[in-house]
């Protein structure tokens, strides 16, 4: 399959009058080897429905389509917020891979608001996520699409580090804990700035994730995430102090923490998601 190169990307963008914007986090991948690497890491299997977010001008889309065809009985759905790019993508696919164009559905939508009604039941995510909303998009997709089993995403390097961080790590925070509710994440490689157009001012990394069951608790996800937000809202404070507002007072927070088996003198950055779930449940059980 003929993938897109730098000249193809710039030429199409010029013809369409498209100028990549920071508002939409647009940095297009222009190196075929890089998109093939991402597609390979997606490990598309027979019967998969692959979800791509932010396909842009289609460089990764074509590589994923190539992988889907190779896997057999796999399909692709691409979600693009920019209507001009969404309208152009089917034309690019028809030009480069006309015999497989029927395997791709393009949806014009905001990935922060999509669900099964728009994209069906995808099993794998592969995406160059917009840098400015990467974490919210990923968390929304995992919440809205329980069929998503695994994925590979390209994000800003420091965001990748936070996604993959574990308790006690320097960059472990609310995004790390919330992602851990849904899935395990690991670093899967680095991506040089030179493969993008325009060239970004930051480095990029690949993050692979695999869904797992959430912690066992009778508390809802929203209740657990409220504890996470409170704990990391005041990172340098002990949990007794940081959760005072959430619990009603520091003394009430201490009682709930002790009921959950968590040290009131600990800080949020030391707790795994299961501990946050126990704290939320302790409040529910009181």
Model segments located where?
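Catalytic cores of RNA-modifying enzymes
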Residues: 1-227, 258, 262, 269, ...
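Primarily a LysM-type cell-wall glycan-binding module
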Residues: 235
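Acceptor-substrate binding/catalytic loop of class I
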Residues: 230-231
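Short helix-coil junctions and helix-kink-helix linkers
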Residues: 244-246
